[in-house]
Amino acid sequence: MEMERINANTIRVMLGNDDLAQRGITVLDLLGNHKQIESFFYSILDEVDKDHTFATNEAVTFQVMPSQSGLELLISKSGQKNDDSAADQTDDEGTDTQVPDYIRQQLQGLDASDQQDHQAVDEGGYIDADKAPQTELVLKLKDFEDFISLADTLRLEGGKSDLYRYKNAYYLVLTFYPNEISSDEAHDQMAVAMEFGDRSPLSSAVLSEYGKRLMETSALETARYYFK
């Protein structure tokens, strides 16, 4: 782990994959348990803030930039005391939603405007998801390692992939567009996918409503990029 003090209000921390592994954290965890993530960030702050210049009654913000080699964490004072009025803006709920949303955008290579786009992207280009008919496979995975293995094996064509977590299990939703890929080709890809998990009776609508979406649109490609 490397630390650089940018100025009196900002610290940059570089954490390699080995540093994350030693602390029991993976890049995927940054999309999961919000309380665990917040505790992790504050534990890093405790490690690097030897002079205690970040007072405990000061609001702190965290910005995360993941990379293939780990992540870069910017820790900044917000310049606001945690009095009653400030607490309304920096309570646990606010922190829980803001930090993971930012990380999710970085992992998926999206900005805020991209999230409003209704186009689906597969590894071969852009597909108009609103107009295209769809064939869907919902796959329940034994664990995250099976998802990584599947991502290494399957180069999805003519569709998109979304990863969810629901009731302590991982689910991969593969959506194919018949106007982009033949039925035989789609079934061949689904057959490969089912070597790594079990077909689930759950629908993508249920997962979207009640589950936690970890990777959107190009989950397989994202996994190959970050989990080589």
Curated annotation (Swiss-Prot):
Superkingdom: Bacteria
A GO term for molecular function: protein-macromolecule adaptor activity
Signal peptide location: none
UniProt xrefs under InterPro entries: MecA_C_sf, Neg-reg_MecA
Family: Belongs to the MecA family.
Function: Enables the recognition and targeting of unfolded and aggregated proteins to the ClpC protease or to other proteins involved in proteolysis.
Quaternary structure and interacting proteins, as annotated: Homodimer.
Comment on protein domains: The N-terminal domain probably binds unfolded/aggregated proteins; the C-terminal domain interacts with ClpC.
Entry protein name: Adapter protein MecA
Organism: Lacticaseibacillus paracasei (strain ATCC 334 / BCRC 17002 / CCUG 31169 / CIP 107868 / KCTC 3260 / NRRL B-441) (Lactobacillus paracasei)
Lineage start: Bacteria, Bacillati, Bacillota, Bacilli, Lactobacillales
